Amino acid sequence: MSEKEAVILKVENLSIHYGAIHALKGISFEIKSGEIVTLIGANGAGKTTSLNGIMNVIKKSGGKVFFNNIDITNIETHEIVKLGVALVPEGRHVFPNLTVLENLKLGSYSRKDKEKIKEDLDWVLKLFPRLGERLKQLGGTLSGGEQQMLAVARGLMCRPKLLMLDEPSLGLAPLLVKEVLETIMKIRQEGVTILLIEQNAFGALKIADYGYVLETGKIVLKGYANELLVNDDVRKTYLGVTT
C-alpha cells in the first residue's frame, strides 16, 4: 500500500452521550492519506460531536480512534495536536484583541522548530495573502471571511497531517464560500489530509473524494463524493433538488 493510500484516521464504533442523549451511536469511518473526506448532515446529526470525540474534547462512551495506526482514543487533546491533528472549530474563534500575526503564532505554540515555523508562516501567508496585508490588524476588526481565513491559517501553523474543519463556510457570502472551498483544495494539494464538516453539502461534495451522511448519530450512507452528488436521497434531503 502506497503512503497516499494508507489510512491516516480510523474511527471504530464511536459512541458519545450527552447525559441521557445518545448523540453518536457507534459510527465507523476512515480517511486515507491525501483525501478530502466530508461528513454531511442536518443540525444535531452528530457532525461536530464526531470531531470533538476524535480530539478527545468530550468523553467517549465507547469505540476507538486511530491516527497513523496509533491508538489516540484516550490521549489528551494537546498530545493529539502534537501527533499532527488540528481542529478548526465552528464559529472561527479568533482572539479579537490579538493581531493577525499573534493569532497565527498561537497556532504553533506546541512547536520548537523556529526555522520551520518561519517557513510555515510564509507558506500560510501565500495561501491567504489577505492576511499578509493585515498582520498588525486586530483579529476582531477583520471581516467574517477574513476571520475564517485566519482560523484556518492558525490551524495550519501546527503543520498538521490531518486538518479537521467544522463548518468553515458558515455565515459567509456565496463568493467567500467559493473562496474558502478553493483554499481547502489548495491545502490538500500541499499534502494535508482534510476532514470537512459542512451544511453546504453541495460545495463539500464537489471538492471531496469521499463522503459520509450522518442522521441522528448514525452513518446512514457513504460513498464516493461524485456518487453521493447524484444519489436521489442526498439530492432531495441535502441538496434541495426535487425529482
Pin down the residues of each PLM region.
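Glycine-rich phosphate-binding loops of nucleotide-dependent enzymes
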Residues: S2-T243
